[in-house]
Design a protein with these regions (language model features):
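Phosphate-backbone binding interfaces of nucleic-acid-interacting proteins
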Residues: 1-93
Length: 93
């Protein structure tokens, strides 16, 4: 579980958003292709489900240190979020 603490669009892309997230014991940066559906302002403060044990990847010159999880609703991504408040760093089982 992660909390989004900052978000901004990746320069030169309509789709990519760079997120700074708190994962409990550290902060990570990730890049997500959700910019056509979410604004950076809508993401700050949200708790999201993410995968943190991935090798870093670079998108348009920006390193991504994880991947957020989303489902699909008629072609639009819907972020997976907890039903109840849980602290950043909580493991998904």
């Amino acid at each position: 579980m992660a909390e989004v603490i900052a978000a901004e669009r990746v320069e030169g892309s309509d789709k990519l958003i760079k997120l700074k997230v708190d994962i409990g014991d550290a902060e990570r940066q990730l890049v997500a292709g959700i910019g056509q559906y979410y604004s950076p302002e809508d993401l700050v403060g949200r708790r999201i489900v993410m995968i943190v044990n991935l090798e870093p990847k670079t998108f348009m010159g920006v390193e991504s240190q994880g991947m957020l999880l989303a489902t699909d609703d008629e072609g639009q991504p819907v972020l997976l979020e907890p039903h109840s408040p849980v602290p950043p760093g909580t493991k998904i089982r």
